[in-house]
Amino acid sequence: MEKNRLSIGHLTTCYHSNFILMQNDDLKTQLNTEIEWKMFGTGPEMVAAFRNNELDIGYMGLPPAIIGIEKDVKIKCVAGGHVEGTIMCAKKKYKGDIQLDNNVFEVLSQFKGSTIGVPAKGSIHDVILSFFIEKYNFQNEIEVINYQQPEIIALDMKSNKLEGGVGTPCLAVFAETLLESHLVIGAENLWDNSPSYGIFFHEDLIEKHPNYVLEFLAFHKKSTTLVRQSPDVAAKMIAETVEMANEEYIKKVLSISPKYCIALSNGYVTSTMEFVEALHRLGYIKRKLVIEDIFNFRFVEKIHPENHHYLIN
């Protein structure tokens, strides 16, 4: 028996390919069901919705999902979407990674005695920042504030409550519209192949309606390919869905971190398991998950049998 409605969760981040798929009536027709799109401010909020059986499908980063799975939330990552979607921006008085030989320690050292904003505890951005704060023993020298609404980070940078922010490419572009700021750490220099988002399905849906997984991933592949191959076209489509951002704004966001694909590549999976180690060491999880706890490969291997496209030519 088919479901009458599928609830799909997505984040506010305008570089995710869901904003293209949200315009496609063919998805509803192909799946022969109503589609309900639900927006969340952070990944941990989406995990809570999965726990409460309010979602069937979700676009989110791997760390909050790992935290949820370890706490018995019944979800599996069935496909990738994008890697290296975390950046750090700051006021222009701070030197960037290019000026400092891509040395993250040197960049962060500039913020001793200052405060940095980052999205919610357990988000991929929070975990990456926590990893480096611990690695360089900056726990008592750099204050970190977590935000449930990531957009507020840029506003607090403008009001001088924060000196910098860690988050999505959207944060960097939004901050530039409000104050004299720039990227101080690019996405490629924070965490190699960091799985900024993947596609998660509730295990109940995978078990009872595996056809939905295959059909959804076919559409996901098309939208992701469009972002990768035709970013200008994608930017126009996304701008039509995201009313708060214009086409040029979206183009700039997409250019900061352009590594899109749906494959679960070796790099994607390896990076995810590195996050498992970091999450365990930092105290976010008590048990180290294994690959099978997180991923279900059988669907994406049918839809995307070719090599991955996360590498930039």
Predicted feature residues:
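Secondary-structure end/capping motifs
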Residues: 209-286
